[in-house]
């Protein structure tokens, strides 16, 4: 899905919870540890959102391409990139670059937004198609534990003074979570209301590992959060590092 109303408020609600500079350094460490290609400084930030991570990766020295399906999010990203980063409006299943990159990152549970296994398989195939042999695909996902115990059927409220947000979750037995966001922006004595609706799905490790293998990736490691340790039973975020095998990627429809 592509954010619309959420784009205007994303950085205020999410930005304060994420240290993008630290996250960029963490991804950089993983890329340097596992990548084996002369193209590794050419990097794709897939589902780049408002571009905060893209900017930090660019500052480290990567030649960054940012891709997102939301034109509204990319408008925010372009203002931050100041012409130094190429931003493209593309969905996972229509990813189309001019050549291969040495590294692909996909952060902040973006892949959880793909709620159909066949669609996730297609997305992995597109990523493999544009990843150079020896290049790496680094992504994070919300875990089944987070969907079951943290998101669940809970409601979260954010009060930022002039901006009020109600975040409501409904999670089913398959660990697909429907998320309803209602934003109230104050202007004087009045409030403007906007809403956003989307779904996220938790995938098992076995499913992710199988789809990566089918796409032409070797799974190098799975880490918890921003660590280099394996995920524990109560891990809310898992980071996958996979290396592109030599040879053809999986067939792309």
Spell out what each predicted region is.
Residues 96-103:
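A short acidic, Gly/Pro-enriched loop at the edge of an enzyme's catalytic core
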Residues 1-47:
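Conserved class I S-adenosyl-L-methionine
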Residues 44, 51-94:
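Class I SAM-dependent methyltransferase SAM/SAH-binding core
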Residues 205-253:
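C-terminal lobe and adjacent flexible extensions of AdoMet/dcAdoMet transferase-like proteins
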Residues 138-211:
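SAM-dependent methyltransferase
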Residues 121-133:
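A short glycine-rich, Lys/Arg-flanked "PGG" loop and its adjoining helix->strand segment in the class I
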